[in-house]
Structure formats: structure tokens, C-alpha cells
Amino acid sequence: MEYQYPLDLDWTNDEMMKVIHFFNKIENYYEASVKGDEVLNAYKNFKHIVPGKADEKQIFKEFENKSGYNSYKVVQEIKKNPNQTLFSKDFD
């Protein structure tokens, strides 16, 4: 699937890489599987770059519109299942 990640050109290269890394973890959830702690660590880094809830919602919506992947759903599922290690859309 070809699409661009929702990035802010005011971010540093390091910040852009952290946001892309987070979205890569979301892609892994939908396309294969991913460890919950990896997603939460990537999300924590994402939140340092995008601390505002409104900005987060906008970026998540842009990503979902382009990719079809719901970042919010993935993060919430992982937070609700702290004892589970591996996550995938096929596991729900």
C-alpha cells in the first residue's frame, strides 16, 4: 500500500522518524503482529512530539484515511490487555 505519513514539516528529522516508527507499529498490528510494549513505547515517544489530544486525533484520522488503520483502536486494545504480549488484528 502506498501512502504518505501525516507529518508536520516543523518537526525535526528525529521527531519525524519517531512518528513514522509509531505508525510502523500500527501497520505491524494490522499486517502481521506486534508486541504490546513496543507499541506503547512508540506511542509514548509519539506523545512527546504530539502532546495535544486534538492534534493526536487529527493525525490519527489522517493516517486512518490514508491507510485504513485505526491507531486509536490499537493503542486502546493494548492498554486494556496489559498481560497479553502479542497483538494482531487477527487475535481480537
Swiss-Prot record:
Signal sequence, renumbered to the chain: none
InterPro entries: BH2638-like_sf (IPR023324), UPF0223 (IPR007920)
Domain of life from the UniProt record: Bacteria
Pfam families per the UniProt record, alphabetical: UPF0223
Family: Belongs to the UPF0223 family.
Name the UniProt record assigns to this protein: UPF0223 protein SERP0684
